[in-house]
Structure formats: C-alpha cells, structure tokens
Amino acid sequence: MASNATFEVEIYGNTTKFENSLKGVNTAMSGLRGEAKNLRDALKLDPTNTDKMAQLQKNLQTQLGLSRDKATKLKQELSSVDKSSPAGQKKWLQLTRDLGTAETQANRLEGEIKQVEGAISSGSWDIDAKMDTKGVNSGIDGMKSRFSGLREIAVGVFRQIGSSAVSAVGNGLKGWVSDAMDTQKAMISLQNTLKFKGNGQDFDYVSKSMQTLAKDTNANTEDTLKLSTTFIGLGDSAKTAVGKTEALVKANQAFGGTGEQLKGVVQAYGQMSASGKVSAENINQLTDNNTALGSALKSTVMEMNPALKQYGSFASASEKGAISVEMLDKAMQKLGGAGGGAVTTIGDAWDSFNETLSLALLPTLDALTPIISSIIDKMAGWGESAGKALDSIVKYVKELWGALEKNGALSSLSKIWDGLKSTFGSVLSIIGQLIESFAGIDSKTGESAGSVENVSKTIANLAKGLADVIKKIADFAKKFSESKGAIDTLKTSLVALTAGFVAFKIGSGIITAISAFKKLQTAIQAGTGVMGAFNAVMAINPFVALGIAIAAIVAGLVYFFTQTETGKKAWASFVDFLKSAWDGIVSFFSGIGQWFADIWNGAVDGAKGIWQGLVDWFSGIVQGVQNIWNGITTFFTTLWTTVVTGIQTAWAGVTGFFTGLWDGIVNVVTTVFTTISSLVTGAYNWFVTTFQPLISFYKSIFGLVGSVINLAFQLILAIIRGAYQLVIGAWNGISGFFGVIFNAVSSVVSTVFSAIGSFAGSAWNVLVGVWNAVAGFFGGIFNAVKGVVSSAFSAIGSFASSAWGVVSSIWSAVSGFFSGIFNAVRSVVSGVFSALGGFASNAWGAITGIFSGVADFFSGVFDGAKNIVSGVFEAFGNFASNAWNAITGVFNGIGSFFSDIFGGVKNTIDSVLGGVTDTINNIKGSIDWVASKVGGLFKGSMVVGLTDVNLSSSGYGLSTNSVSSDNRTYNTFNVQGGAGQDVSNLARAIRREFELGRA
C-alpha cells in the first residue's frame, strides 16, 4: 500500500541565508530552554541556592537577547516581502506570525527575569505559578494592529488557501481512486487465475485476507494481491499463498521496510518463486530494498540448513545452486512469525489509512464500471452519427461563407472576434472546472480551448446550407435528449462518488465564476452579438464535438441580428433580459456567501461540541488511569517497604551477631598479648634491678683507682715544688755571691731531676701495670655480663618466637573459623540477594509488560532500594572496619610489646655504659680531689727571677720579693706603660696572664 500524499514546496526569493540564521537562533533557544528547565527543577529541591538563581537569570537574559535579535531579523525580512504575488503573501503571513510569537516570547521572558530578580533579593525561590500578562496583552494588541493589514491581501490569501486545499483534496482523491483502480485490476487478475486453476471458490478468502493484511500493515492491497496471485499461479493452494504473502509483508515491516520498499522486495521474491531458483541478482535486489530483511533472511537460511555450512557463505551456496526457493519460504515464514507486522510508525498508520479509503472506494468503482462502459459505448455511436452529419454541414457552411464574404458580414465578425475568443475562453474554463469537479475529466477543458481555435479556422471555409445545418443539429439534440436517462445515472453515480470532496472546491469555483460572469457582462454590454447565439447553442449541448456546428450557427445568427430590424429589436430585448438575469445571478451568489457562512459557523460549533466531548471523554479516561496507577503505586510501595524492612531487620541481626563475635575474639587476643607484655616487662625490670649493684661496685672500684692515681700525682707535684722552693731559696741567698757554685748546684739539680724522672717513670709503669690488672679484672666482668645479657636476649628471642608461633596458630585457627563463617554468610547473603534479584526481575518484567510508562515511579523506588542496599553494605563495611581495627590493635600491641622489650635492652645498655662513664668520671673526680689535697700541702709560686736581665736599674720589673708566714711568695713588679698606654689596663692584663698560667 503506497502513500499518495503529494508535497509542493514553494520557494520565494533567495531566503537560504535568512532561514539558516533563524535556524541557528531556534537551535540556541531550544538548548537554553532545556537548561532553564533543569535549573528550575533544581531550585524546587533547593529553594535557597542563589547560585542556581543567578545562572537562571543569566540564561533568561540570553534568551531575551536572542528573541529580540530574531524579532529584528524578522522585521527586516518582512519589509522586503513583495505582497503582490501569492508566494509573497504566503511568506508575509508566515513572517508576521513568527514576529508576533517572538515579541510575545520576549515579553514573557522579561516577566520571568523580574521574578528571578525578586527571588534573588529575597534569597528564596518562591515563584507563584502565575504569568504576567501585561506584556503578552500588549503583544496581542500589536498582533491585532498588524493583522489589520491583511485586508489588502485577503482575497489573494483565500484564493491561495482554496487552491491549495482543492489541490490537496484533489491529489488525495486521485490517489485513492488510482489505488482503487489498481486494486480492481489485481483482483480481476487473481479471480481469473483462480478460475484457471479451478479454485474460483477461494477468491473471497484470498481477496479479503489480502485486504485485511494491507490495512493492518504498511503494504498495498495491489502488491499483496499480485504476490498471492504469483504463488497461486505457481501451484500453491490458496491457504499456502496467503501464508507466504503474510510472512513476506510482515517480515518486511518488522525489519524496517516501507510500503514503497515492499514493491521491490515483492518483485524480487516473486521472480525467484516464478523461476524456481535463487539467484544472486534477485537476492541483491531484495537486500537493496530492505538491507536488514535481506541480511536476516540469509543468516536464517544458513542456520536452518546446517548442510549449507560446507559452502562457507550464503553467496557461495547460491552460486552453486544449493539454496532452493523452499528454503527461502521456510526462512521467510520464520521471520514473518517473529516480526508480527503490526502498524508501528506514523507513516505506516497513514499508509494504512490511505489503503482503507482506497478499499472503501472499490465497491463504488465496481458499481460505476458497467455504467460508464455503457455510456462510452453509446457516445461512440453518437460520435459516428455526428461525423456523418458534419460532412453535409461543412458543405453548407462553405456556401454560406462565400455569401458572407460578398455582403461584408465577415468584416463585422472580425472586429468582434477578439471579444468572442475572450468570452468563449472564460465560459469554457467554468465548464471545464465544473466537469472536473463532477467527473475529473481534466482533458476536456484543454480540448475545448483547442476547439475554439479550430472554429476560428473553420469559419473561413464555411458556405451554404444553414437550414440543413439547423435540421441536423435538431436531430442530434433529439438523439442526445433520448439518452437523458443514461446521463442522469452517470451524474448521480459521480456525485455519490465525490460528494465528500466537492465542498472544498466551492469557494474557488464561486470566485472563478464571479470573475468569468463579470467578463461575460462586459462583453455583452460592449455589443458582441455573438453571445446570444452562443448561449442558445450551449443550452443544447456542452460537448466539444459540436464546435464546428456551433460556429456555423453563430455565423448565421450574426447576420440576422446585425442586418435585420427584427433581429436588432430581438437583440435589444435579449440584452435587457440578460441584465435582469445578471442581477439575479449576483443576488444568488451573494446569498450563497451568507449561506456558506451559516453552514461554516454551524460546522464550527458542531466541531467544538464534538471536540469538547472528546476532551471530556479522554479526561475521564486519564483520570481513571491515574486512579488505577495510584493504587498500583501504593501497593508496590507498601510491598517494597515491607520487603526492605524485613531485609534490614535480618541483616541487623546478622551484623550484630558477627560484631559481638568479633569483639569477643579481639578481647581474647588483647588479653593474651597483655599478659605476654606484662611478663616480658617484669623480666626486663628484674634484669635492670639485678645489675644495678654491680654497676655501683664498678663505680666504687674506679673511684679508688682514681684516688690512688691522683694521690701519686699530688706527691710528685709536692716533691717538685719543694725541691723548686729549696733551689729558689738557695739561689736567692747565694745568687749574688756564689755564681761559680751555681754550676755545681745545677748538676746536683740535674741529678735530682734525673732521679725524679726515673721515679716518675717507675711510678707510671706501676700505674700502667695496676691499670692493666684493673682492665683485665673488669674485662672478665664485662665478658661475663655480656654473656649473661646475650643469654638473656637469646632466651627472650626464643620465648617471643614461641609466643609468636602460638599467636600465629591461634590466629590461623581463628581466621579458618571465620573464613568458614564468612563463606557461609556470603553464600546465604548471595542467595538472599539472588532471590531478591529474581523477584525484582520477575516483578519488573511483569510491570513493564503491563505498564510501559512507569519508568519515573520505579526509578524512585529503585533509588530507595539502592540507598537501602547501600546502607546494608555500609553496615557490612563498618563490621569489616571494626574487625580490621581489632586486628591492627592486636598487632599494634605486639609492636608495642617488642618495642618495650628492645627499649628495655637499650635502657639496660645505656645504664651499663652510663655506669662505666660515671665510674670513670668518679675516678677522675677522686684523683682531682687527692691532687687538690696534696697541692694544698705545698704552697708557693713556680715563677723564677730572670737573673740575666736587670730591670731594677731602669725602674722596671720586679721591685720587691717576700714570702709570707703561710709560705706564700709575693712579688711586686714596677710596670710603666708606653706613650699613650693606660698603666692600670696594662697591670690588669699582666695579672690575667699570671692567673691563666701563661706568665
């Protein structure tokens, strides 16, 4: 079933650039409106979000700018439109409507922007669902003022609308009639084929099945009938042919094929069925028309026939002739059964509507066919009689023409011929439109116009025989009158066929008729005497076949009305009659206008009532569906809440059980490690307490050794100081007198110092020996201590290793225990969720199978389910987190335990080494103490006089020297500073040098 709609595209001027510009604006506006909608929805959920309000305000301002730009462009384009042509008028209307829409939209956007500004100021999105109609009303007023300009083009617009409507209806009617005629031919072919095969009784079954198939799908009845006829002609039964055709048509539509593509598919499949073989050419033709169907057919044939796999592909198998038409038929049956073939798109529905109308016209066409055929046969007889009569007419007119040339009648005729042609053409145009409205005989008007030209040529050859001509015409009129019954039957049938469509042409016909009659009135008033004869002849018969006879009558009557007094008077009275008749015509058509207005108003009121009834009916249906849906949503919401609550309760019990179990395990492990830590800490404290007296013992030994060494050094120092004082005293007593004796004393002193050196060396060796003995003694002690510490740490390491092995074995047992539990829990939970998933899947499948529009509801439901499941897994995550924290706590306890152990070892070593250090410091302090005591026994100064430098004579140097009762030596120096030097500062510096031992 093919679509018969015809689309006419009128292009006015070069508007490509302008239309592309508007298209870009419309695209941008569409995107902005979508964004604004999302922002409004977001503000409903978060009414205090001022950022969203600012974004919406910016969006609306952008829309307002685009609307104003669009209005400006429309005004510019509107100013350049030429309203004198139908295309210009059509474009002017379109642009005016678009301009009004753009300005109304701009006013609405201004109101919305003010609302958003108020919301931003208040900080809350509380917009009332009201529209500011102030701007809209002004826009409507502007539209009213613009539409006042429609008066100047109203007539042209309505003419264009009427012409377009008549054209559309005419095209649709022609298409439906054409489809009905094609279907009639296909049915005749099917009927003849069935009769030839001896199955004429199956005609009703096959034809009705094909009509039903065409109405239910996007196929054409003609195509389905042809295909089923092909199958029947090849020997299939009526039932088999119907099944094959249904499978092919439904498969084509199921795989996206249209009614036009079905023609190519049917042609290719029919050729393969007729030839009895599957050719690559026909398969490619089928695939070209419906690629998806061709691919599916090939794959299905290969799947249903495993033996074809040896050829590798469908193409190879078809080239080898391994694929039969029977294989194709079975595969097509499978594809058709899977597809269903129901009407699925708007285009398919429209094709189905066209096919339904075509089939509705079929009974009328069948009834008209014998009547029209009979009339055509009779008209053929009339034409033969008229042809014989014309021979004598031509002969007579030739004689008449000669007489007219002689008396000057032709000169008068030539002057008025131009007016006659114009009038004749207008009247014939009216006749042509009327004939087209009732019978669709478009070609007759053109033939009539051509006949006028033929008449003008024939008049030059007209001659005599006016009486015979009139007699022949009367005979012809009598013949035509005798056939009045057949003509009435034809007219009644045609009116019954087209009654539903003539109304669309009445407006155009009235306008054209008024124009034509106005031209006719002008021609009559101009004195064209041919009109009376023309009307008289037209009252007899409108058919073009009488053109030559009419011309002859006109020629004879022209002479009568222009050359005789009687004719002139008759013509004057006829003109008066036409004037009164014209007034009646004008009144008649004026009344028709009011009549059509009343009919139209009644039709509009009736349509409004019907529409309101439909609206109320659909509103009731919608309300009923809403009530049913609310009940369904309430039921499933309650059901889901119950299920979720049960799951939450069960899961809370599971998590509570495992949380308590895990806390118990953590407490046990923590207690074990606390016990181990306490044990090791006690051992360490015992070790430190045990070795503390030993350290004190070492310290006392070192203190004793230090004291001995310090005492020895103090004795040596005392001897040296005593000897030194003796030498100084002797030197002071005899220095002035016994210079020679000094060398002897020097040798004595040298000997003494040698002895002292020997003594000091011997003393040092003794000290070294003592020290070595002490070091050996303490080395043995430290080696013993090191062995004890090493043994202690080895024991601690063994103990910790054993303890760790025990802990590991305990943990392995615990982890194995919990692994089994968790595996069991995982299986249980997996089973529960699998059951829930199966339940949800089945419930969802059933619900979507019944209600395809509940996506929003179940979206919310499953969002809730998602949150619940998320909460469940969050609880599971908390449980796992607690377990992990407990495990890490245990291991942190282990780390702290070993940290304490090694910290204790470090502290032990620090204590031991610290004891050694303190011992050495104590020994040093003891020696220093003994040395200070020995030094206190031998007071005095080690400063000696410089005998070889006499400073007394110059007033510098040592001035006095004395020894006090406590054996202290006091030396008095006379110090003078150089130029610019402070003596006090110089004395302080010298004293500081003495105190530091550097002088």
Swiss-Prot record:
UniProt xrefs under InterPro entries? Tape_meas_N
Annotated PANTHER family: FELS-2 PROPHAGE PROTEIN
Could you list this entry's UniProt keywords, alphabetically sorted.
Viral release from host cell, Viral tail assembly, Virion
Q: Which GO terms describe its biological process?
A: viral tail assembly
Write out the similarity annotation.
Belongs to the skunalikevirus tape measure protein family.
Organism of provenance: Lactococcus phage SK1 (Lactococcus lactis bacteriophage SK1)
Chief localization class?
Answer: virion
| GO cellular component terms, semicolon-separated | virion component
Q: Where in the cell is it found?
A: Virion
Purpose of the protein: Probable tape measure protein. Serves as a base for tail tube protein polymerization and acts as a template for tail length determination.
Q: Which Gene3D superfamilies match?
A: Apolipoprotein
This one is known as Probable tape measure protein
